[in-house]
């Protein structure tokens, strides 16, 4: 079975109808071995379920998360991570500017 491609989003642009997304941001907090909080500086943070992936990164590390979007019983958005990539060499300020430009096209 083929997976859908992940839509590139910033946290504040995530829609409830999104199925598979990718979000780049900083690890704000690693709560347990089960999840972390991701912050892309767009406002809100998002909970990332990391039960199915290895996370060799620490807090404040820049990562890209690819996974399925879920809504919790409380109505919060959560990403079930399939892939986590190291993005430390990315110029995050330029990335955010390019994202805004692509959004207007």
Question: What feature does the model see in each segment?
Answer:
Residues 1-105:
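OB-fold and OB-like single-stranded nucleic-acid-recognition modules
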